[in-house]
Every structure is written in C-alpha cells, then in structure tokens.
C-alpha cells in the first residue's frame, strides 16, 4: 500500500512539474496562429529551396516574411545567429546565455525547445524593431536542417 502511494505521488509530481519551457503557450489568438503558420511555411521553404535561397526571401522588406513587427530569425543549435533581418548586427554573433530584461535566459529556452521538442513557444521581454524598451513577446520555434546542420527558424509577436 505504501509503495502504491509513493508511485502515485511521484507520477503526479512528474505530470505537474514537467519542464517549464515545454508548458508555455500563448493564449489562443489570430497573432499566435499567424506566427505559427509563418514559421511552418518558412521551414517548408528551407527544406524545399535550401538555406541560401530561403534566407534571401526572408530578407525581402515588405514581404510576407519581413514587415512591421514580423520577421524571421534563424540560429544553429549552438546559438550562432544565422539570420535576423530586423536586427542584422546580431548575425554572426552567439546568443547562448542571453537574458531578457527580467533575467530570463530566453535564448537558452529557445535552443532547448528546438533541440528537445522540435517546436514550441517561448515568452520573453524584447524590444520591438526600432525601439529600445522591452515588450512582452512570444516566439514560435521550429527545428530545421540548414545545409546539413541542425538549427531553428523562429518568429514572434508582441501581444496587442
């Protein structure tokens, strides 16, 4: 009887206390649906046309990929920034360990989602393009193969 109780308690703890980053998801919204669809289409384009051709498309201003607050970014799974047309100075840098304005290691969470789950959501505080003050942001991440190397493609939205 005691063993059964301990097993039940252990199982309940696992269900309730699973990895925090895998439990995140934004409230259902048109913004969240649009970002998830955008990332899914971007991953398909990378798979179909390859990294170089896809990244050329993702950098085109006023396209479905880059307009207003909407942009795609790509990292390898070590945290090297391969694409970020909204913040081009970040390209070629490593973001592993970067924290948001509240001290959350959000970049590590993004890398973990891609590596461990293949896709998912992460929330964090980040400035909108052209601004310096952080705002709440939700990012949808999807693991992809970038010219034979594992990486991720992502985009996000700032809730209205």
Predicted feature residues:
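N-terminal membrane-sensor/transducer module of prokaryotic signaling receptors
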Residues: 2-11, 15-160
């Amino acid at each position: 009887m005691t063993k059964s109780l301990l097993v039940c308690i252990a199982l309940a703890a696992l269900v309730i206390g699973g990895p925090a980053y895998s439990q995140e998801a934004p409230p259902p919204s048109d913004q969240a649906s649009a970002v998830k669809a955008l990332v899914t289409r971007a991953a398909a384009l990378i798979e179909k046309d390859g990294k170089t051709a896809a990244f050329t498309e993702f950098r085109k201003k006023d396209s479905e990929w880059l307009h207003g607050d909407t942009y795609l970014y790509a990292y390898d799974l070590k945290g090297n920034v391969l694409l970020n047309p909204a913040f081009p100075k970040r390209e070629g840098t490593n973001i592993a360990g970067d924290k948001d304005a509240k001290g959350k290691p959000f970049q590590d969470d993004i890398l973990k989602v891609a590596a461990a789950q293949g896709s998912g959501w992460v929330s964090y505080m980040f400035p909108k393009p052209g601004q310096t003050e952080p705002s709440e942001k939700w990012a949808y991440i999807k693991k992809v193969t970038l010219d034979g190397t594992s990486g991720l493609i992502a985009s996000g939205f700032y809730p209205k």
